[in-house]
Amino acid sequence: MTIAISAALTSVVSSCQQAQRKNPLLEESKLPYGAPDFSKIKTSDYLPAFESAIQEQREKIAAIVDNPDSATFENTILAYEESGRMVDHVSRVFFALTEAEKTPEITEIEKAVMPMLTELENEISFNMPLFERIRQVYDRDHETLQGEEQKLLEETYKEFVRKGALLPDDKKERMKAINLRITDLQQQWGDLLLEATNNAVVWVDSKEKLAGLNEADIEQCKKDAESRGGKAPYAIVIINTTQQPLLASLDNRDLRRQVYEASIHRSDGTGKINTYSLVSEIAKLRAEQAELMGYPNYAAYSLEKTMAKTPENVYAFLKSLIAQYKPEADTETKAIEDFARQTEGADFHLEPYDRFYYSAKMKNQILNISDDEIKSYFTVDSVLINGVFYAANRAYGLTFKQRTDIPTYHPDMKVFEVFSLLYSEENREIGRAHV
């Protein structure tokens, strides 16, 4: 009985402590630039933060709609712009994490959050009293406002129109359903692609078949095999790109073929996973979206807000690139194939899984240098500081200074202040970069 009472009291105390703890995602950050304090943020904070932020925006939207005063830029356009600040903040923090370090826990939260955000977007986009207030301000003030205010008004009004605010009621309902379905399909596709990539492994039964790899790569293959159940002594894990770096070193051509095919077939139905039906349905729904909005196809609809503007401009740009690059690519391919035939015979035909391998050998013979020799010059820090930061400075006048007082969500991540030489001395700090 005493033990039971003690356990119950402990549970109550723990619950009270949790209730008293403020969600750091919803609190104003005390860190420089308002950076999220990852030393305080827990995985369990994200879903409640989204729920709270979404409810906050709903309440602010309701306040705009219920305002008895005539619609103005301040009480409607600016108020609407401000209404989603917290949702935007939580989203930026969370989705940066999903792109860089997606754990099973984060994946489950994402599955719960995406429909919530889509439902919120539907509610706002098809909130006719809200749109009527926005339209009143647009019709009255879009030619008299200046600068940023005019730009914000135009962007707000046009975004509502692009999402279907002017559609008949039946088409609005269809657009809502399409939005929700696409969100669901995209989640399924992302989950399957991640599963396919994580499961894409080529098992190797002997060290001899790994000839050409350096000892560090061979040791990594051994560790990867052990961590994945040890079906064979070695495993080549497929990374999330079509071409695989190890193809440049593997002497065994059949193994190169297996690695390449494991990469390109990871989710096309050759193995357990097939995303074709998902992609096909997404494409059909996007085409229907475009048709509802009066566009000939989804490309025309999606490109309207981009620099390219139209599919025709994209095709023209691609054709100009092909005209310039294809002859060079063909010449290079022939040179690599001719080089390979010196050792493989005149009938040798260069396959996609051969290109990296013979290109590296040709470079080594012509320039007397190998990829292994230059790897030491391409450490992460060197690429970042001597490559990315150097180029940004030369091209845009940006400089970077590391900050060690801003917590990150991963020990390898670094934070840098970003300065611009285009501004005066007191205004040169323009933000931060997490890398």
Where are these regions (language model features)?
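C-terminal motif of bacterial Sec signal peptides marking the signal peptidase cleavage site
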Residues: 12-15
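Active-site-proximal, well-structured secondary-structure segments within enzyme catalytic domains
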Residues: 152, 181-184, 191, 195-237, ...
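Sec-dependent N-terminal signal peptides
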Residues: 1-6
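N-terminal helix-rich structural modules
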Residues: 20-221
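Short His/Asp/Glu-rich catalytic/ion-coordination signatures at enzyme active sites or charged loops
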Residues: 30-45, 94-113, 135-177, 237-277, ...
